[in-house]
Amino acid sequence: MNIRPLHDRVVIKRMEEERTSPGGIVIPDSAAEKPIKGEVVAVGNGKLLDNGETRPLDLKVGDKVLFGKFAGTEVKVDGEELLVMREDDVMAIVE
């Protein structure tokens, strides 16, 4: 199944963080925080403005991004956990 976000929404796949502390302790899944970094896998066609025009999104597929830990809505597509959020919820592009 394909997922295509509407308007100013983007679909993001979380990027797994390191599961070992600087001291070498392995952090179990139950104690680890969800990553706030991810990769854009799909983008909508743009933000609908008040005047009826559509502004293209700044994000593109493949961008590595940072977002808030409570941003977006989690969805499962073909067994893969993804986040759907508005472009405004993305804080930065990691270059």
Curated annotation (Swiss-Prot):
Species in which this protein is naturally found: Alkalilimnicola ehrlichii (strain ATCC BAA-1101 / DSM 17681 / MLHE-1)
Family recorded in the similarity comment: Belongs to the GroES chaperonin family.
Protein name: Co-chaperonin GroES
NCBIfam families in the cross-refs: PRK00364.1-2 (NF001527), PRK00364.1-5 (NF001529), PRK00364.2-2 (NF001531), PRK00364.2-4 (NF001533), PRK00364.2-5 (NF001534)
UniProt GO BP: chaperone cofactor-dependent protein refolding
Molecular functions (GO terms): ATP binding; metal ion binding; protein folding chaperone; protein-folding chaperone binding; unfolded protein binding
Source organism superkingdom: Bacteria
Subunit composition and interactions: Heptamer of 7 subunits arranged in a ring. Interacts with the chaperonin GroEL.
